């Protein structure tokens, strides 16, 4: 076995005389490896051999030797004897081929300029082997030759500065740089059908075609015109543009799936550097992929770190779809074509707007596969702003890799584990690859499962096409298909091992092997991971239909009583989304299971506590006075229960600070017990709080110590791509940790570049800001330059790092450098602040973002006026440096604000009249020159929830733009979801015991519910809503040099849920 050495740039070019002598020499055995191929089930069984060669001249032996070689090799032979037999056969084959090549080279040598040193480009030679006959040989042979000036003292320098169009990019590359070059594999004494299906793509034949130009942008158009299946790596390993041509679609898909496995291993190799290996091996193909292939392509590119629990309340897509259809039928009535895809009869799964003419709006894609995901949109073309009722779509100027027509932008983050054992890694990858329908050509009997409905995933898809010119849905077709998973013992064993480790299930007998569909791998393990006492406990982010499916699946065909399985889960549910559905499913599976809910403040606490050996949910619904008065008694009950349970949920309606500290201290003092703060549910009090505690035990059944990194939680995440980078960089790969660098990052970046570098600079700036100023100018030599600058937008920076689109070379220095004279946001030490101070950080950032959007959309050069209602001390003055800033407040004006202050108050019963009066006072002619800001003034000025709603309705009727930063009361679970989604059966939450979830709780001041506030503005197409999470606020706090206090960590999730910013543009 040789040590793999990657070639350098110079290794790909050898002088023509040396090249000829190499063809006359025998096959070099020192760069060759022959590896035994063994079956997974029986490692002692050898079914063939794998031949690889680490020599640039022989990287591609398939044109010479074919896809496989049949030799008579005695298994008892030693390695050296086996190699001798193979080399003898290969030399005989190469001798004939090389003789033909030498004769052709002699016949075409007249075309070589003898005044220069001819060099041979080896990648072109590999392609030349595919066309041994035909007139194309002569022309390609001439392209293979690089002429180097013989008078040049340094031939290498002349080579790098050659004017040949194929090598125009070489002047940007270090000649000693290593280039990852793929090894071509040839089977010996085996066929592709003998190879495991996840490795067949390693041996499929393909041709490498080099473009006769250095323009990579022509590659898409080139492969689109050819009839054969073709594809290319978006990040090539060599600088010359090239693509791969396959014999059939089956070969291309086999190669695609093999590269998916390699990508999975590269991405999760923690020791590999970015330059040592190409992390993303996937191909961009010239034919549409099945949806499952596209999903697989994204799935394998995600790393597997254990993520923290996050709760996302997201808007439904129905209003978005209506808005897009309206937009298409009005703004693009003559050009737009809308394609609609419904998956499993969800409200909307996919919508695409495309134009038939000039690409003013080439494509907008929206995906929703679970009805509970964050929805984004990606455009291919110029910047387009589309305002929807609930801001469900953010349009980004991005061009992402098209792995298929229906590429899901978001997929579950519960993925297969990364284990120390290579055997289990092979298991996990086999299951990942099995989600796709395998090509028929290489299906063999032992891989083809029986057609059993219970083991298949039924997917019903409805395609519709809407033509706005006629106003009707032009076509409609339905398709139902079943995805079958190969039923082999290793797939089953892997599932059983994970479920046993997470949930304590016993081994399943081989004869009763259940054939699980792939959702058990993606969801079943996530569910088991969540409810395992040794890990993070109950799941909060799963949809009920998924939980129902998993519960029914894991109890099918298992030689364990259902009641015993359920009892192992120890589900004690209350105050959990979809709790009624879970309870219903548990009782449907086993009617005798006792799903117990308890409160520590009932008459039978101690009796209940004796049986609480698993998980318990506790609700503390007494007043603060009672908590203080009976603190010792309550803590006694509380400690009794904690001694018996492995973990649970504690919900405080209105926690008393002293009692809360006692509870948290008691939880933390227990050995091996951890406490986390969750976003609160089912409460109208702004101070309600939910704690999650669990015992961090070690299960002896766990196969590896880091099993917690196996399966991440069920979350949905969007990943956008650029055309030049197909990998998905994670946050820590993109920029250093926010906690260490953000507080010292410069406030603005600028660039000066030529036109060729402009796309890179704009791409970099777009990851840190939503707006930039760019200008072009010509120097004294007549060379055009481009310059620009962008101020960092913290929210955009967070979006970029979260969605994975931030380039790894941002900021690009010295091409993009910090602007001189711009103050740095530096702070030597962190300042500890409370939750209210942290929550107030986000409001100004939202307001500034909306102001920048408003400024960018204005075409008038008139003065911009910002009117801050209730601003008082002018704290927001710094957000609008290029606008006339005026404060409306009845309080006395500060000394520095006297010249920009109006003491006559705003009339909240007559918004239009107040606006007209202020415009007359300031001499403003057009209301579109006005930007209104209401920063928390609604809370103090409006004393009834109905008044809030009325104020928003009036605000929406004004002709100016406005931003309202306010608070809403926490809604009950069903009310909260109703403000975002339609009342679909699987999203409604009906708790069984209403005593634990009353709809009203005491509130310190009257606030409207989120649903009431949304109802006031959802009918206004100009409005959008901003809301953030505690994690994002903590990131921003680190950037500005703030650290949360202990009380802030406890109460921040609840306060974040209250804080909301409405914008009307």
Curated annotation (Swiss-Prot):
GO terms for cellular component: viral capsid. Changing residue 243 to A: Complete loss of GTP-binding activity. Its EC number is 2.7.7.50, 2.1.1.56. It is found in: Virion. Keywords: ATP-binding, Capsid protein, GTP-binding, Methyltransferase, mRNA capping, mRNA processing, Multifunctional enzyme, Nucleotide-binding, Nucleotidyltransferase, S-adenosyl-L-methionine, Transferase, Virion. It holds the Pfam family VP3-like. Transmembrane segments: none annotated. This is Outer capsid protein VP3. It comes from Cryphonectria parasitica mycoreovirus 1 (strain 9B21) (CpMYRV-1). The lineage of its organism: Viruses, Riboviria, Orthornavirae, Duplornaviricota, Resentoviricetes. The gene is S3.
